[in-house]
Amino acid sequence: MTETEFNNILTNDIKKVEHNLLSFLPDCKDGQESVVQAMEYSLINGGKRLRPVFALEFANACGGSKEDALPLACAMEYIHTYSLIHDDLPCMDNDDLRRGKPSCHKAFGEDTALLAGDALLTHAFEIIAMSDLSDDKKVSASLLLAQNSGVGGMIGGQVIDLIYERQNPSIKQLLNVYKMKTGALISAACLMGCISAGANENQMACASKFAYSLGIAFQIQDDILDIIGDEKELGKPIGSDAQNDKTTYATLLGIDKAKADVEKLTQSAISQLDAFEKTEFLKELALKLVNRKK
């Protein structure tokens, strides 16, 4: 696949997602404008759109339609966006900026930001329920998304990560955090794409293995970039983990070992794609994500 072909597919996928994201927003009623505006503000605030792209591309890899997967892809991005709003709150990471713009609570106030996050979370499941997919697929997608974004996935990973900020976690414990915090939502995205296309059990299993291996590699690469990344390329200061005395994979094992494990995990992820058709784009995307500079 040429660079131009890859970029065309990625651009078209992102355009499809961004065109539909706002169309799923709830209608404003008297007095509710501020929370819907905060939802919209956060949804359109850039980002890689990584998770919805995975949903669309796994639907395609299973022989399904990207159009059928679009509601699930957008629901996935609603969940991801709510998590970012809550991450930025003063009680969590206390970040004033998100992708170079004021974070939601700085733009709309803490109370509205909290409610906007809650609204995005709950509305994600309404998007799935109102889609044209079969009832079985709606139930499967909703259950999967709830499990992977809840205590058994992203939320659980956040809780454990907070605990480890006051401790010195082992590599095994760190990998579990990465699996839950990052891998779980990537897995949900890939699997929801599979669900929309009616994937078989083997494809579901392979998609899950792909997502978790890539998710962990993605997080380790983040750790590496926080040590040796270029601040101009990243668009944020480096060294925040060290300043906060936070233990990461790269600080525990060193840069060279971390880089080697990113490569190993990425190749493990790519090997799972043998269960699918039309995987050239997914292979290239996996490589670009773990070799990124920002």
What are these regions (language model features)?
Residues 15-16, 25, 29-272, 277-290:
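Mg2+-dependent prenyl diphosphate-binding active-site environment of isoprenoid biosynthetic enzymes
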